[in-house]
């Protein structure tokens, strides 16, 4: 769902994400409180999920490839990553990254830095703008947003699996079961 321009103005003026008359649930159809927290995460999603599960979140890069654009002076990449916890993918993120500096370009080209980490390396808090969000037919949710600063601009679409807050750590096999 995309908010109307009036709703968006109310929701996101000065970082405000709810108001007395407008809510994320009403505008985007996102009703679970933890889903709403994830929808408004501004570059710290990996840390939020790691804290929730008390386990490391891995970012698995499917691809990160340059986009050739002869009409632009900026370097661009398209990326797809999967965020996993307990070896289970809970989010797939597709993004377009446009860099405006050599420092940001080197970090993106390295392929070792996630987008949230990129801003930390650059010591910059990006401007977060939620463009749209909503539930998926399968029971998960999605969001489209941008992270922007003078050195880099990221346009990101994330799709979260159903039951994203109910993932289970695989059961450890007991010593007795392994020895059989």
Predicted feature descriptions by range:
Residues 2-180:
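Composition-driven recognition of glycine/serine/threonine/acidic- and proline-rich low-complexity segments
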């Amino acid at each position: 769902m995309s908010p109307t321009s009036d709703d968006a103005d109310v929701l996101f003026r000065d970082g405000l994400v709810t108001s007395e008359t407008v809510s994320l649930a009403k505008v985007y159809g996102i009703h679970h409180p933890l889903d709403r927290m994830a929808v408004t995460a501004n570059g710290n999603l990996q840390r939020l999920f790691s804290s929730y599960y008390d386990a490391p979140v891995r970012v698995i890069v499917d691809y990160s490839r340059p986009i050739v654009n002869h009409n632009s002076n900026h370097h661009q990449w398209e990326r797809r990553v999967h965020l996993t916890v307990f070896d289970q993918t809970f989010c797939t993120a597709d993004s377009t990254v446009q860099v405006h500096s050599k420092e940001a370009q080197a970090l993106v080209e390295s392929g070792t830095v996630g987008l949230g980490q990129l801003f930390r390396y650059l010591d910059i808090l990006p401007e977060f703008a939620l463009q749209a969000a909503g539930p998926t037919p399968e029971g998960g949710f999605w969001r489209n947003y941008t992270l922007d600063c003078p050195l880099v601009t990221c346009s990101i679409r994330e799709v979260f699996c159903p039951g994203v807050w109910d993932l289970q750590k695989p059961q450890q096999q007991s010593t007795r079961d392994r020895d059989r």
